[in-house]
């Protein structure tokens, strides 16, 4: 799944490690989310969206097959 996490994180001057700490996940999880190798749980998706004051749809781009 494509995300705008990296774009939002950089715009807000937040490191991967800082975001990971705030979300309660590892830095590797944030890296995997940014590269589209991992799909966030619903809970994590809400937390990330809330962190950036965005809706889930603004952060995570869902593409139907």
What is the role of each PLM region?
Residues 8, 42-43, 56:
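Short, Lys/Arg-enriched C-terminal cap helix and immediately downstream tail that follows
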């Amino acid at each position: 799944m494509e995300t705008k996490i990296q774009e939002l994180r950089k715009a807000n001057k937040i490191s991967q490690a800082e975001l990971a700490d705030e979300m309660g996940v590892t830095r590797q999880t944030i890296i995997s989310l940014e590269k589209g190798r991992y799909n966030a749980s619903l809970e994590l998706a809400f937390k990330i969206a809330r962190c950036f004051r965005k809706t889930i749809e603004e952060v995570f781009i869902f593409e139907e097959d």
